[in-house]
């Protein structure tokens, strides 16, 4: 028995030592974009060992001034998924840590409003409804208070459902796009709830060719609602879920989605697409390296893969 106890103590000490060593070995990053050399038209893993680790990282976004970088991290044993932040202070980036409201419940899929004053996200925190309490993935919002974030409150209650809802994004018009499993277990489709007269309407599923009989999710919609980038498990891809792009046509329908190709997509799953506020870089998550990591690539690929859509190039700043 004594040998067992000693062995457990040694294992615990080794675990703590490895954890501390991992923190101490974290690289010091300085300068814009966490000191990374900007990628060209070949995607690269973003900030390995600092942002992208052996755990799962997804849903990344910079603030407009480029001095804060937010993302979700999941897969740490015994801990919920959390929204993380690293900040550039005196030109040096702080070690990523959970934002002040995150770390108790599962929090993922953050969206920062363009002015940086509000964060909308998906959370499994407890919802009290009359005499009942439930935990469900719904949308919550926190307002910025100095360097911190305010108490979470529910967001767009008219649009959400008793099923799982994820990846909220709000456009300039106030319309809310997200994906939901309200079609039943194992399903996933992209929905839109319009913002009319100060309220959100009941969400409606986007028509084909955006949604299909297969799973669609994680839609990044441009602020003018003329471009949508999303993940889909439809046939014809490279495996898992692939990232596609579609543009709004003159008749208000969506163009046939284009697969973003095998530099971005792989035999694994790709999802969580975003574009940096300056329009220069395209970020996404992929499991192509064996764990969920954040990758980035020049946003010029969007114009190059769909040359006839050059009228949308102001969305993408390639210089």
What are these regions (language model features)?
Residues 1-25:
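Bacterial Sec-dependent N-terminal signal peptides
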Residues 23-319:
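Short, conserved micro-motifs composed of acidic
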